[in-house]
């Protein structure tokens, strides 16, 4: 595996900005209308303007590393848009929420994808402005757990960029752990209209958040991924105090901006997979119904 030198990014939301701003020479894939919009109103991250190079899908050339940071709701379009940026040796990293994006990308570009997850950030995006305290890190690895040459090449590249990263031999465990977090935190913040600080207070939002997280732990165990029974408590005790109390996870940001949410990737996937085992998911049923109701009310 040769050294990674060229890179592209698709998706300039919170994660795309957080990581893309540190990738020298990264090409941001965007259609012409979006390029015009981005050029007219540049991204500002923690008060600093970010300078990106934009490239239309039809003008792409293969790159060494392609970072996919779109919302799950537009993944299929992104897969089409990045076609010309994928060459024989391109490595694809997807930092999408949920546990299914690598399967979708892998179906279109077999053999190119490393499994990955972005954790520990508390970024809040409003329009073209992003504010964060914690920049987070990318955990990644082969689905098989093997520490291959391309895993090392990606680690070397991210290190050189100054992006915190962790090559993993247990990436499926890490993905399910992140799903547990999103399933609780993201959905509770959206359904109960609460920032991080509100979720730290005892009450219905926190109760439902914990119940949803427990359902993910139970389902992960059924799927052969050994999340510990107290995994939710460990996360909440360790990480919640580090988050900006006024900040909020991405799903609440989507709801406030009246954007489609990723509820299908959280409660939707949990409910669907749980059916295989006859496992009830009352907390995720509640979140799925409530968030779909919120989305349905956007235009009323």
Regions found by a protein language model. Name each.
Residues 7, 25-27, 111-114, 165:
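Hydrophobic anchor at the start of a short beta-strand
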Residues 5-6, 24-26, 64-66, 88-92, ...:
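Short active-site oxyanion
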Residues 2, 210-300:
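NAD(P)-dependent Rossmann-like dehydrogenase/reductase catalytic/cofactor-binding core
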Residues 34-39, 102-103, 148:
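Short, charged/polar "capping" segments at the starts of alpha-helices
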Residues 85, 108-111, 129-230:
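Internal alpha-helical scaffold of NAD(P)-dependent oxidoreductase catalytic cores
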Residues 45-129:
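Rossmann-like NAD(P)(H) cofactor-binding subdomain of soluble oxidoreductases
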Residues 28-31, 140, 271:
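Short internal beta-strands
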Residues 1-52:
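NAD(P)+-binding Rossmann beta1-loop-alpha1 motif at the extreme N-terminus of oxidoreductases
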């Amino acid at each position: 595996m040769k050294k990674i030198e060229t890179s592209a990014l698709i998706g300039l939301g919170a994660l795309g900005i957080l990581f893309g701003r540190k990738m020298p020479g990264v090409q941001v894939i965007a259609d012409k209308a979006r390029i015009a919009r981005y050029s007219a109103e540049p991204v500002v991250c923690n008060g600093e303007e970010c300078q990106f190079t934009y490239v239309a899908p039809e003008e792409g050339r293969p790159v060494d590393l392609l970072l996919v940071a779109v919302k799950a709701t537009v993944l299929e379009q992104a897969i089409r848009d990045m076609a010309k940026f994928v060459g024989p040796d391109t490595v694809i990293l997807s930092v999408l929420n949920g546990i299914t994006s690598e399967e979708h990308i892998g179906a279109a570009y077999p053999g190119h994808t490393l499994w990955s997850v972005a954790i520990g950030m508390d970024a809040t995006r409003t329009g073209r402005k992003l504010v964060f305290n914690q920049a987070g890190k990318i955990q990644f690895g082969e689905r098989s757990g093997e520490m291959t040459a391309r895993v090392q090449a990606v680690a070397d590249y991210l290190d050189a960029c100054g992006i915190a990263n962790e090559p993993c031999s247990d990436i499926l465990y890490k993905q399910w752990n992140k799903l547990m977090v999103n399933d609780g935190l993201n959905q509770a913040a959206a359904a109960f209209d609460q920032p991080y600080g509100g979720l730290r207070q005892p009450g219905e939002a926190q109760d439902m958040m914990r119940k949803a997280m427990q359902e993910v732990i139970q389902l992960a165990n059924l799927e052969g991924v050994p999340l510990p029974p107290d995994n939710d408590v460990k996360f909440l005790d360790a990480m919640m105090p580090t988050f900006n109390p006024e900040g909020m996870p991405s799903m609440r940001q989507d709801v406030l901006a009246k954007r489609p949410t990723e509820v299908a990737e959280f409660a939707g996937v949990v409910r669907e997979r749980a059916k295989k085992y006859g496992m009830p998911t009352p907390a995720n049923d509640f979140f799925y119904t409530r968030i779909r109701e919120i989305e349905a009310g956007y235009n009323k």
